[in-house]
Amino acid sequence: MQCPHCHRETVVKNGTRRLQDEQVVQYYRCRDCHRNFNERTGTPMARLRTPSRVVELALKNRSEGMGARATGRVFDQSHTTILQWEARLAEHADAWSPPAPAGREVTLEGDEVYTRVGENLPAADSEGWTLTFFERESRYWVTALAGQKDEELFKQGTETTWNWAQGADFIRWFTDGERRYGQALWPLASEYLPERGLAISYPYRKVWREGLEVAMKIKGSQGKPRVEWVKVDHPFTAISPSSEVHANHNEAHNAALRRRCSAYRRRQNLYAKAKTALQRTLDVQ
């Protein structure tokens, strides 16, 4: 074990302490910096006086669709305490994100979901848009960013998702009819082909990275869906059948999100009051 303060391994045990829920916490002392800490230091449970079982059940109820004030009434806590527990957990969300599996194929589905934030503004001016990316095979929720539906939101969401997936050898990037996904991904994942060793019949020089396929499914205003590949694919990248280009799993996940997260529930006064609060509820889902 390393010391969380000086990051050295000269650590010895320094007694135990029994908490209110009868849980025993081990304490340690560093011989170099002479500072004491316990096994909870640096975790969401650090310096928490409430029994861990109560915190676990409260956050589980929040992730199953119960509002913050209702959760506080059930567990005899203030709603601000519930929100502080969520903020603690959201701060450590990045540490629990596994990287994309190297040497395997990754299929990403991108979509947006809308909810009200603060005042009841038009959808174009609201900060309640949430950009989500979903890995098809593992059902892993890669990215969830809340904000106004503009180029900055698509840029941040695309960059976060690409940083997670770029380690995989084969990436399939499927979205809905929104073209700003491809526009944000093009500067990150495009490359120039060498002039030598390329067939004359292939007229393009700037293409997607080898192994990356970017396509979107357009539903169409007349009920005639079609599939469109974005930009130019690498000549050595395999193309998927049109039937596999969709974001159905992500759309189903967004529908389930409206049941599991109270801030996304329609026709109920449970919306988030600010964008930061909406992002916090997304991080703990």
Positions of the model-derived regions?
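Residue-level recognition of single "structural anchor" positions
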Residues: 1-285
